[in-house]
Amino acid sequence: MKSKLRVLRAERGWSQADLAERLTVSRQAINAIETGKYTPSLQLAFKVARLFAMPIETIFSDEDEL
């Protein structure tokens, strides 16, 4: 799964640790999502979408999507 998490985080000047704290997850989880090694749960995806005030599909997309 592709994500725009790294870009959105960087635009706000947040470190991985900052974002992890806001989402109550580990920094390692943020790193794994950003590198595509981990697909977030639906619950976490909704938390991310609320935090950035964007639809989930704007932040996350299937790698096979064109």
Model-derived features with residue positions:
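Short basic helix-loop element that most often maps to the first helix and adjoining turn
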Residues: 3-22
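Residues in the recognition helix of alpha-helical DNA-binding motifs
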Residues: 8, 22-23, 33, 62
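Short, charged recognition helix plus adjacent turn
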Residues: 50, 60-66
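Recognition helix of helix-turn-helix/homeodomain-like DNA-binding domains
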Residues: 25-38
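Long, hydrophobic alpha-helical segments
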Residues: 42-45
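Residues in the helix-turn-helix
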Residues: 18, 29, 58
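Alpha-helical and His/Cys-centered functional microenvironments
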Residues: 20, 31-32, 47
